[in-house]
Amino acid sequence: MEKPQIELPVGPAPEDLVISDIIVGEGAEARPGGEVEVHYVGVDFETGEEFDSSWDRGQTSQFPLNGLIAGWQEGIPGMKVGGRRQLTIPPEAAYGPEGSGHPLSGRTLVFIIDLISA
C-alpha cells in the first residue's frame, strides 16, 4: 500500500475515539496488549498539519500496544493484517489536556494505520 492521504472529518472535533475502517484486512487479528507492526501517518485535527509518519521514514514501526497512547490501545485491537483504519483521537486518549508536557497535548489527532503484522 502507498502512503495514505488523510481526509479530515468535517465539523467539531469529536469528544470520543472514532474508529473508521478504510480497508478491512483478512489476516491475523490484533489483540489487546499484543505486539503489532504498522505503517502510519498522523495529523492534527484542527490544522491538518502532519506531525509523524512511518512512511516518511521509509520503514514500518513495531511495538507492544500496551506501550502506546490509549487511542491506539483501544483503536487497533480487532483490526486484521492487511487492513487500513482511521482513528480520530481526542486529547484524553492521546497526550492529555493542554499543558500536559507533550507538544501534542490538548490536540485531537487523526491517524491512518496500516496493520502489517499482529
UniProtKB/Swiss-Prot annotation:
It catalyses: [protein]-peptidylproline (omega=180) = [protein]-peptidylproline (omega=0). Belongs to the FKBP-type PPIase family. The keyword Isomerase applies. PPIases accelerate the folding of proteins. Its EC number is 5.2.1.8. Keywords: Isomerase, Rotamase. The lineage of its organism: Bacteria, Bacillati, Actinomycetota, Actinomycetes, Mycobacteriales. InterPro entries: PPIase_dom_sf, PPIase_FKBP_dom. One of its GO terms (molecular function) is peptidyl-prolyl cis-trans isomerase activity. Residues 33-118 form the PPIase FKBP-type domain. This is Probable FK506-binding protein.
